[in-house]
Every structure is written in structure tokens, then in C-alpha cells.
UniProtKB/Swiss-Prot annotation:
Keyword Nucleus attributed: no
Family: Belongs to the 7 kDa DNA-binding/endoribonuclease P2 family.
Source organism of the structure: Sulfolobus acidocaldarius (strain ATCC 33909 / DSM 639 / JCM 8929 / NBRC 15157 / NCIMB 11770)
Highest taxon of source: Archaea
Gene Ontology cellular component annotations, sorted alphabetically: cytoplasm
Name of the protein in its database record: DNA-binding protein 7e
Subunit architecture: Monomer.
Other observations noted: 7e possesses the tighter binding as compared to that of the proteins 7a and 7b, which may be due to the three supplementary lysines in the C-terminal region.
Keywords from the named record: Cytoplasm, DNA-binding, Methylation
pH-activity profile: Highly stable from pH 0 to pH 12.
Amino acid sequence: MAKVRFKYKGEEKEVDTSKIKKVWRVGKMVSFTYDDNGKTGRGAVSEKDAPKELMDMLARAEKKK
């Protein structure tokens, strides 16, 4: 699986796409929640910086609506 690199509250983070639970679009950003060792973490990345796997997850989520 691919890793998503993003900044959250000024801190550089990286999360594996297999840990991502929910994905949605906010303007030109892709927001997501992920499993952070039992807690729910949040992150966002621009569409142009998002890996293909994350964009595929977003397309599946939007298709369900």
C-alpha cells in the first residue's frame, strides 16, 4: 500500500493508505480519517499531491452517495 504524507497542526505526518477509514473532498483538498493506534486521526492533502490509491478511495466513496 502507498503512504500519504501530509502536515497536520504544523507537524509532518505519514500514514499508510490501509489505515484510512473515511475519505471526502473539501474543495481542492482530500480530507480523511485514519486509525492512529486506536485513536482516530485526521488529515488532508491537496488533490495534486494525493497518491493514486487515495484518489481511488475517494472515487469509490463519491460513487456510493
